[in-house]
């Protein structure tokens, strides 16, 4: 009887040891970077007041007419870009503010007076340039790049007076450059526009263009390095016309 008890205890210890070893192996597997983590080019950083998405090393395009589906695994960030002119039931490129380039095709949108400029991405370049530079727009289109028009928030390190009234408090977002890097930057909380600009300048932003915001227009999403998608602001209408797509 005593011998049988000893054998039983030995068997129990062996099973426990094997089980413990299996758990260690499972843990190691969980810590192995996923395919998304290995190829995740966007970097996300936060400050006290800002969320900064570094998209310097990412591929960019401008989606028009239909917002990319949140299930598209290769999309790591999708946010509204240029202003939409009118709330229409059907899509028209002429309802997007200013010249814009989507999938390498140049379209002319509606015109609006003010301090507007263009952000473009092509051939691994990301650049801001003044509205009216037709040669540059055609260069971007020939290279199958992307571009959209928006108003200056910061130009050459100085705050810019926006052409639209921005006295109310809300979430604000811009596309920006500093120290050779390109970012999409959003306020963490509802703030005044002047405070948002102040935060950007304190972070050393040199140039920045506004991105369409406001209730419903700010609906967007991003995907973290594990592949999980997160909705940024709820969807309240179907009138948005164009989105910056980051892959």
Regions found by a protein language model. Give the residues of each.
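Conserved beta-alpha junction segments in alpha/beta enzyme cores
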Residues: 149-179
